[in-house]
Amino acid sequence: MDRLNDNAGNFKRNSNAIIGANFETSTPSQAQILTKNWIENLNYRLELCKNDDEKLLEILNSHIEFERIHPFSDGNGRTGRLIMMYLCFQEKITPFVIEKEDIALYMSYLREQNVDIIFEKVKELQKFEQKRIDKF
């Protein structure tokens, strides 16, 4: 139980940063309200989507926004990827997994905020996952 964060599960109390990022994350005083607004906006935008590709683009855009808010002291990346998985299930679109060996590339895409490149990569990942799903 070494190195446990005493703030686990709560909004950050101290400023944090993403190594290699070219932007600042939200301040501790902004984190909770920005996260609340993020959730409300995400749900609204998902309701407006007309097809699975629009839903996926919205999920990816919202993921970039979440990572920029960076509301927790630790675990924002894992939490953000888990939220994307949850949203895929919620919206009944094929989920995808970002493998360990792809994390550096994924991080560079996030830094660039290039949702089109992320979208193309995720479409490939979805095809792979769909093949695995179809085996069952």
Role assignments for model-derived ranges:
Residues M1-F136:
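FIC/Doc superfamily catalytic core
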